[in-house]
C-alpha cells in the first residue's frame, strides 16, 4: 500500500485545495497501478510552520510563497 506524504508551508493552501490534492494524488496512483490501489492509497498532508522551510538557503514564510504565487498568476 502506498503512503504519499505531501509537505506544505502552513497557510498557503486552503482546505478545499488540500482536499483536491488528496483526490488528484489518489487518482494519479490509480491511473498508474490500477483501481485496486484506490482503497489502499494513503495520502498524508503535513503543514510545515511558516519560516521553517527554505529555498536556495533562505527561509520562506507563508507571505513569501503567496507573493510568488501572485507573480506567477500575473504572468
Residue map of PLM features:
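A domain-level signal for the structural core that forms small-molecule/cofactor-binding pockets
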Residues: 2-75
